[in-house]
Amino acid sequence: MQKVCITTVKTGPLLLGMALLFAAAGCQPAAPDAAAIAKAQAADEATIRQLDADWVKAGAAKNIDGWDAFYADDAVVLPPNQPIANDKAAIRRSVAGLLTLPGLSLSWQPTKVEVSKSGDLGYLHGTYQMSMDDGKGQPVHDTGKILEIWKKQPDGKWKCIVDTWNSDLPVPTSTAK
């Protein structure tokens, strides 16, 4: 005759352990879903587009203080045919040089605005149109492209941290002999 051995397990501690495990799992923060991330990105992209439109208005008004207000404290500006402007004073000199050109008319439009999934960085690229007077009072026209990198600041506001632009036109050649 064969002996059958039945072992009993106390279920109280096992059930308590499982309950604690499930309770701890339920306390984990839920990962943001794709729809929430996309909604936040779209809102931030709209904010950057509006800030950029306001920046264009400051440029059209030749408002140096208004223009400078869009830059973060640690911004860098990479203007064409000039050294890098990597502090507030250098940026202001560069902007003042641009906005005080005789006969200046300047505007730009974003082609694309994108914000990172983390929501702290964004970029914008687009095109610009500019007219000014040459040294003889004749109009000079230029078109080109722009690139701006924006960063959300600790206070939640967006500021430009990198700004650059350059012409689509070929470099003029000298006709002097």
Task: Say what each PLM segment does.
Residues 28-33, 143-171:
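Short beta-strand edge/turn micro-motifs at domain boundaries
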Residues 115-122, 151-157:
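A short, structured loop/turn motif at beta-sheet edges
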Residues 42-47, 64-118, 127, 132, ...:
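A solvent-exposed, acidic/Ser-Thr-rich amphipathic alpha-helical stretch
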Residues 12-24:
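Bacterial N-terminal signal peptides
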Residues 1-9:
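N-terminal secretory signal peptides that target proteins for export/translocation
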Residues 27-69, 73, 172-177:
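Short, low-complexity N-terminal intrinsically disordered segments enriched in polar/charged residues
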